[in-house]
Amino acid sequence: MAVPKRKTTPSKRGMRRAHDALSSPVYIEDKDSGELRRPHHVDLKSGMYRGRQILEPKDD
């Protein structure tokens, strides 16, 4: 069974955990509609992606 030879210091533990934080999702303003949407994702209201119609727009 593997056992640590030395105690991990709080500094080393913190450096290891430095990349574990969760980041909030990024939103951009759509050029055509002005709505917020995720980058590199289809705009669900208009159904457009990169200037092309991908989905049928929602009629609410």
Curated annotation (Swiss-Prot):
> Which chain positions lie within coiled-coil regions?
none
Q: Which InterPro entries does this one have?
A: Ribosomal_bL32, Ribosomal_bL32_bact, Ribosomal_zn-bd
Q: Where is this region: Disordered?
A: 1-34
Alphabetical GO CC annotations of the entry are: large ribosomal subunit
Biased composition, class Basic residues, residue ranges: 1-16
Q: Which GO terms describe its biological process?
A: translation
Keyword terms: Ribonucleoprotein, Ribosomal protein
Q: Which GO terms describe its molecular function?
A: structural constituent of ribosome
One Pfam family it belongs to: Ribosomal_L32p
Q: What family is this protein classified in? A: Belongs to the bacterial ribosomal protein bL32 family.
Q: What is this protein called?
A: Large ribosomal subunit protein bL32
| Annotated gene | rpmF
